[in-house]
A protein has these predicted regions:
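N-terminal secretory targeting modules
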Residues: 1-45, 49-61, 174-176
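Acidic/histidine-rich helix-loop elements
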Residues: 13-16, 70-75
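A Trp-anchored, charged/polar loop motif used as the substrate-binding/catalytic surface
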Residues: 26-30, 34, 76-88
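Short, mixed-charge, low-aromatic patches
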Residues: 35-43, 74-78, 113-116
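Alpha-helical cap/lid subdomain in secreted, periplasmic
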Residues: 60-69, 76, 85-185
């Protein structure tokens, strides 16, 4: 993609109201309102993979004690997360860690575009929450196209390393444990 081209995956765009009931915007407004007065140690942001974490024991056992907030929305792609974070979801909180897991729903976008969208989200988080550690989780292997999944991981790892090499607050991982200071287990 040339520098003059617009990347749809990195252009903040409200989510599509597929149910026709305003659910997406209502959920966004709930996140903005719910974050006021909260002091989360961890913020999870992303699509349905993040949203569904509430249903698992690991959330209750590990993340609830950290006063974690879950800003996952089913169906969201990178451009939707970028819009939500640009429009108030980060305004009232200062988490120590932001966990980002998104990209699965970027149908029709190239690996380069999806990577650009993820990097735009990481940059926005850095700008709005400069003290937060950002953890970008790896991608699930897309059943329909394993080659695209692998290319996406390689592209984002390469671009991410080039763009954030001097910043110790960002890590992309395939679900390895990352401790404070960047130590990987």
């Amino acid at each position: 993609m040339s520098s003059g081209d617009s990347n749809p995956a990195a252009t903040p765009t409200p989510g599509v109201d597929t149910q026709g009931d305003g659910r997406w915007m209502s959920l966004h407004n709930h996140f903005v309102s719910n974050s006021k007065g909260k002091e989360p140690d961890v913020l999870f942001v992303g699509d349905s993979l993040v949203q569904l974490l509430h249903q698992f024991e690991v959330w209750r056992d590990l993340f609830s004690p950290l006063h974690a907030l879950n800003f996952g929305v089913g169906g969201d792609a990178t451009q939707h997360v970028l819009w939500r974070l640009s429009n108030g979801e980060l305004a009232h909180i200062s988490p120590k860690v932001v966990v980002l897991w998104v990209g699965t729903n970027n149908h029709g976008h190239t690996a380069e575009q999806i990577c650009g969208g993820i990097m735009a989200i990481v940059q926005l988080i850095k700008d709005k929450l400069p003290k937060a550690y950002t953890l970008v989780l790896g991608f699930l292997k897309l059943i329909c196209n394993i080659q695209v999944s692998v290319k996406l991981q390689v592209q984002c790892r390469t671009q991410g390393e080039l763009e954030t090499r001097s910043t110790p607050t960002d890590t992309m991982t395939d679900c390895v444990t990352v401790r404070g200071g960047g130590e990987r287990v």
